[in-house]
Amino acid sequence: NPRYGILLCINGTGIMNSWIRRNVTQETLDYAEMNRLAASVPAGSEGLSVVPFGNGAERMLCNRCPRAGIIGLDLNRHTTAHILRATQEGIAYSFRYGIDIMRGLGVRPDVIRAGAANLFLSPLFRQTLSMLTGARIELFNTDGALGAARGAALGAGYYKTRGEAFAALRRLEVVEPAEADR
């Protein structure tokens, strides 16, 4: 009995955030400080946008390589904080684009379950993503690598049930989409 699933892979997101850290902040800020600084800027980054597709072919874009970009930069207004927020917003919008593709295939993701790691450590990113997708986000005490390993072990028959595979995980936080922000 074969099973099929849908994977949303946004190839450029993680590297976009680390590229910004290396090249814009010159690694003077850790990710927690980047998150705090990003949150100091209003939603929409005062017209600054970041397109996070700069790490090769994007599966959800039919394997095209659209590249990354910083759009709308006003040298008299925008600061590092604006770039940091625009980066998180751009990644959240790319995630939304992928969710829209999934919805077009008949999948209705009402809940996003993620490990409490990487960009999901940013309250700004979590709330923005939840608001853009209309999905509840549930954070668990894991990360993507361990989640993938559990999924592979389940598929290989190491675990008998999905419940068994994920039994050790604890839900740490739930983020609901803020209706007022939609």
State each model region's role.
Residues 1-182:
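Glycine/Thr-rich phosphate-binding loops that ligate phosphate moieties of nucleotide
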